[in-house]
Amino acid sequence: QASIESGALIQYDREIKFANEKFDPIFAAYAKIDVETLATDPQHAEALKVGQRLFLQNCAQCHGSDARGQNGGFPNLTDDDWLYGGSGATIVKTLQGGRNAMMPAWLDAFGEDGIAEVVEYTLSLSGRQVDQELAAKGKTRFMACAACHGMDGKGNQMMGAPNLTDNVWLYGGSKRSVTETLTYGRNGVMPAFSKTLGDDKIHVVASYIYSLSNK
């Protein structure tokens, strides 16, 4: 049994090596073309098909096969709402090194009543119907949130702090979800793919992702 398994592993390694030798030059050639061009120039359509296959193999488990994400911290990659920025270079950086996002819990600082006030104000930023009296009180407390999200609530891509004015919610935009976010905080982790895919394949995946919101 051990001999059979060992033989199978050796054969698998040989097949991987053969595939790499065959396709690595193709990925290297793609990597010489900037992400934006690779994503939008029709003559590079085959590269996007390859990028899509790599996406389905490595990214779809979290972001979905349609790349539209899901509640629970997995962002939609098909819109123009980017936590860290949507340039080709930024997408490559995200794929290479991953991201670690942390939203602190505010229950100790605000208390339950204070949380309720900030929730009302936060929801008002995207035009929602809210309790105006609570929202007015929440606006004062929001000063503590402005260090990351900005005084206008439009976020900060350098920090990965989301825009709170566009009604796009990573963990859900219901009053209950926003209350949970403020009460308990959030920790979002995007894994690094540098070792898994290598820079050339990452370049192709980034081009596919870029193409989804730049059609």
Q: What do these predicted ranges mean?
A:
Residues 2-11, 73, 78-107, 117, ...:
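Extended, polar beta-sheet/loop recognition surfaces of beta-rich domains
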Residues 44, 48, 52, 70, ...:
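Solvent-exposed, acidic/flexible segments
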Residues 72-78, 96-115, 122-133, 159-163, ...:
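Axial heme c-ligation environment in periplasmic c-type cytochrome domains
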Residues 56, 112, 142, 172, ...:
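Conserved catalytic core of two-component sensor histidine kinases
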Residues 43-68, 79, 93, 97, ...:
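Sequence/structural segment immediately N-terminal to covalent heme-attachment motifs in c-type
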Residues 1-42, 84-90, 105-122, 195-210:
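Periplasmic c-type cytochrome electron-transfer domains
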Residues 155-156, 172:
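Flexible loop/turn segments at secondary-structure boundaries
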